[in-house]
Amino acid sequence: VRDAYIAQNYNCVYDCARDAYCNELCTKNGAKSGHCEWFGPHGDACWCIDLPNNVPIKVEGKCHRK
């Protein structure tokens, strides 16, 4: 497990405005908890605590949305 920005397809973060949204997203994916990290390196994005290793996370590089 690890603490990280949870990622969507193409290495894109989940944008957020509310902690509740991120906490629900993170816990649904097996994390202990989550919150909205404001003004972080990837903008306002969901940060998860103790996210399982099989869940994709934001890695180095750009978001490749089509």
Swiss-Prot record:
Any one GO molecular function term: sodium channel inhibitor activity
Alphabetically ordered keywords of this record: Disulfide bond, Ion channel impairing toxin, Neurotoxin, Secreted, Toxin, Voltage-gated sodium channel impairing toxin
Distribution of this protein across tissues and organs: Expressed by the venom gland.
Domain of life: Eukaryota
Protein name: Toxin Boma6b
Purpose: Alpha toxins bind voltage-independently at site-3 of sodium channels (Nav) and inhibit the inactivation of the activated channels, thereby blocking neuronal transmission.
GO biological process: defense response
Domain characteristics, as noted in the entry: Has the structural arrangement of an alpha-helix connected to antiparallel beta-sheets by disulfide bonds (CS-alpha/beta).
InterPro entries listed in its UniProt record: LCN-type_CS_alpha_beta_dom (IPR044062), Scorpion_toxin-like (IPR003614), Scorpion_toxin-like_sf (IPR036574), Scorpion_toxinL (IPR018218), Scorpion_toxinL/defensin (IPR002061)
Record SUPFAM superfamilies: Scorpion toxin-like (SSF57095)
Assigned GO CC terms: extracellular region
Cysteines engaged in disulfide bonds, as pairs: C12-C63, C16-C36, C22-C46, C26-C48
Family: Belongs to the long (4 C-C) scorpion toxin superfamily. Sodium channel inhibitor family. Alpha subfamily.
Subcellular location: Secreted
